[in-house]
Amino acid sequence: MKTGKELKPGTVLRIDNDPWLVQKAEFTKSGRNSAIMKTKLKNLLTGYKTETVYGADDKLDDVILDRKEATLSFINGDEYTFMDTTDYTMYELNAEDIEAVLPYIEEGMEDVCEAVFFEGRLVSVELPTTISRKVVYTENAARGDTSGKVMKPAKLANGTEISVADFIQIDEWIDIDTRDNSFKGRSKK
């Protein structure tokens, strides 16, 4: 059993005996009302999508999933093909199925992912919590602006934008926390 506040993208719930994948989860807490979790869910059997709100303390039936290590093999349009690192089996997913990790996926990436299976079927892919990516564009630092933690926008090779520290330059490798899309520092790559 999981509570509403424990939901995150990639979690699979059993609702009316169907497996539902949490594609997006946003925790909201206001001063007056109790905390809630706004979620976007996708039925893994029918593909139907819905938005649902759960209370932070609501009890939900989660599903035990099989997990295997996999790497991105290639991208063909909206189809992403992953390969099992132990037996070299190929699995395909649509862009919709991996919407949560799509900003970090790029051709030629070397990160080992975790392929998530429900009853023998690949349902999603989870990335490591920290990944390294190359900055392809960023503005120069503003002179004299050194008060506090100064951030600026940067663009990665796949077009994703992220806020980075002021000292990061073009062609530098950075570490990114995939849980909250935050800049962690320069990569040792």
UniProtKB/Swiss-Prot annotation:
First-listed, main subcellular location of the protein, grouped into a coarse class: cytoplasm
SUPFAM superfamilies membership: Nucleic acid-binding proteins, Translation proteins SH3-like domain
SMART domains linked: EFP (SM01185), Elong-fact-P_C (SM00841)
Pathway assignment: Protein biosynthesis; polypeptide chain elongation
GO biological process: peptide biosynthetic process
Any Pfam family the entry gives: Elong-fact-P_C
Subcellular location: Cytoplasm
Coiled-coil ranges per UniProt: none
List of glycosylated residues: R32
UniProt xrefs under CDD domains: S1_EF-P_repeat_1 (cd04470), S1_EF-P_repeat_2 (cd05794)
Gene Ontology MF terms in the entry: translation elongation factor activity
Post-translational modification remark: Glycosylated ar Arg-32 by EarP: arginine rhamnosylation is required for EF-P function and rescue of polyproline stalled ribosomes.
Keyword Signal carried by entry: no
Keyword Glycoprotein tagged: yes
Keywords tagged on the record: Cytoplasm, Elongation factor, Glycoprotein, Protein biosynthesis
Gene Ontology CC entries for this record: cytoplasm
Family: Belongs to the elongation factor P family.
Functional summary from the UniProt entry: Involved in peptide bond synthesis. Stimulates efficient translation and peptide-bond synthesis on native or reconstituted 70S ribosomes in vitro. Probably functions indirectly by altering the affinity of the ribosome for aminoacyl-tRNA, thus increasing their reactivity as acceptors for peptidyl transferase.
Identification of the protein by name: Elongation factor P
High-level lineage: Bacteria, Pseudomonadati, Pseudomonadota, Gammaproteobacteria, Pseudomonadales
